[in-house]
Amino acid sequence: LHLSIRRQRQMCIRDRYKEGMMDQVDRVIYDLKHTPFSRRILTNIYVHQDLHEMNLYPCAYSMTFNVTQKKGDDRLTLNGILNQRSQDVLAANNWNVCQYAVLMHMLAQVCDMRVGELVHVIADAHIYDRHVPIVKELIERPQYDAPKFWLNPDIKDFYQFTTDDIKITDYVTGEQIKDIPIAV
């Protein structure tokens, strides 16, 4: 996932639990494996004491995981809720959805779960005035079938994933739009 150095540090801070020292990702994986029906499985990178060091506060800032089980199914299903305070729809929507969907697949795989729903809650989704013509152009373009996503099924340790373990096939795209102005 693309995160600033400060945000990466927030995810890697290790805290003491009765089970030992863990960062947020370690804690999520531990809980998914040991207490999957807990209502406390989440990450949060919106750390107020660090905000003064950031040019841009975290937009997508927390992920809550919810595990369900369908009647008659031996495997559990991992669902997630992504909370986001703000989103530049043109510049970030596809990126946010894809990165957190891949994260869900990775976590589900290493915890031997099925992938369920990803619910994306955006408090302020916006299209800037200068983006309106670009968005109109994109809406008018031909639509293509969704590409296929593959995750190396042999990886069972979250920290062993590399970019080589993720493949996108049958990806068809129109002409690239370049130089999209980004607001900070």
Provide a role label for each language-model segment.
Residues 22-25, 115, 132, 177:
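Alpha-helix initiation and N-capping motif
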Residues 34-159, 182-184:
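Conserved helix-adjacent loop modules within structured domains
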Residues 170-184:
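Structural signal for terminal/edge beta-strands and the immediately following C-terminal loop/tail
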Residues 165:
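Phosphate-rich cofactor/ligand-interacting catalytic cores and adjacent structured alpha/beta frameworks
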Residues 20-23, 28-38:
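Structured secondary-structure scaffolds
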